From Swiss-Prot:
Region Self-association: start-end pairs: 1-93
Lipid attachment, kind S-palmitoyl cysteine: C274
One matching Pfam family: NUDE_C
Biased composition (Low complexity): 324-335
Organism: Rattus norvegicus
Region (Interaction with PAFAH1B1): 88-156
Name the UniProt record assigns to this protein: Nuclear distribution protein nudE homolog 1
Amino acid sequence: MEDSGKTFGSEEEETNYWRDLAMTYKQRAENTQEELREFQEGSREYEAELETQLQQAETRNRDLLSENNRLRMELESVKEKFEMQHSEGYRQISALEDDLAHTKAIKDQLQKYIRELEQANDDLERAKRATIMSLEDFEQRLNQAIERNAFLESELDEKENLLESVQRLKDEARDLRQELAVQQKQDKPRTPMPSSGETKRTDMAVQATGSAPSTPITHQGSSSGLNTPETFRCGLGSPSSGTPLTPAARISALNIVGDLLRKVGALESKLASCKNFMYDQSPSRKSGPALGRGTKNRDGIDRRPGSTAVGDKGSGKRLEFAKPSSQLSSPALPSTQGVVKLLL
């Protein structure tokens, strides 16, 4: 201590010194006690406050623990739900993948089916075009058949005209034979009779002219020859019958026309030879007896009313046969003009 080595001048001074020092220490002790008391009060208050805070903290801790437990339970439930959702999502994803694969397969099948439909459509369009072309060809052939029918009807009309001319020539031949017989009876003393061979040939020509054609046409299902225009028309078939004319029937019809033309030409030549023979035997004969046939001119040609001479009639008939037909003709058949010219 610093005061232990201090020296005093007197005892009173030392007593005062120690009294002052004691008072100082006493004051310090009182101050320290006061501070201790204040500190204790403050510590008690602080302790109470800490206890209060501790209680609050414990309460809060309990609340937090309960909340933690609740959150853990919720977490477990959420985990379970997540696992369930995950498994459900996986199943849905698997199902969607299967559906996607199935949809892709269906899409491929549909694309294949579309390609097949397009190919079938192309085939149908080609078949349609082929059908249209076949229909056009059928219409063309139908028109050709109609033209052939019209041409054959014109041929039938010409055949009827030929039959009428043959009948007229037969009548004229019969009249000429009768006239020749009468003139032979009148000129018997000075005109020799024609030979039996010539008469026989004339009769045979006339009979051949009136006989049936050498190439008959038979209708389907019929075995008899066609000798008249009606049977010939039935044999060829009308345009509305629907049966097309065969090439053999066309050739037969042309053969009939050719036979008729040849027979008409033979008959005309026979008539001309008979007239020449008759006029050579009697160059200066008078007009014939009144048999209702008109008069003859100085050349010996019969000029009956409403009729022409046999030679003129034959020439006119030849010219009439040589005229082209005004009816429609088929490209597959030769024209009547060419046939008549070839036959004449």
